Amino acid sequence: DYLREFGYPQQPEDLDHHRLIVYGEAQPLPVTTINWLLEVGAQPGHQRRPAFTVNNLYGMYLAVQGGLGLANLPDYMVPPDSNLVQVLPEISSPPTQCYFVYPEEMRHSKRIEVFREFLLRKVAETQF
């Protein structure tokens, strides 16, 4: 188990001594702040080097599950029965903008309205 071997980070600066799994920068980043673990708590002008890069969130989840290191995962990706634990819960990821786009002619559609309300409810319940 990764945390048994490397210990729990107690503060953001401790991430300097951990293996971080991030979204590979060779791919277009889906969210510009997705790799914020490389910078949070780091010395000014110093960015951590990732131990492992992956090109999708599910791959990051599998890498963490496999004990390769720590990653920033949205809570909806971690099943309730998972053996993964949240570290540094007092730290939140930077805010991310998200857009729900649909054709203008569908603006009065009941389906669009219901789906929009569903999305807003789910986003309000999710932590990143």
Where are the predicted features?
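A bilobed periplasmic-binding-protein/Venus flytrap-type ligand-binding module shared by bacterial periplasmic
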Residues: 98-108
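C-terminal regulatory
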Residues: 1-98, 124-128
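Short amphipathic alpha-helical coupling segments at ligand-binding clamshell hinges
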Residues: 107-121, 127
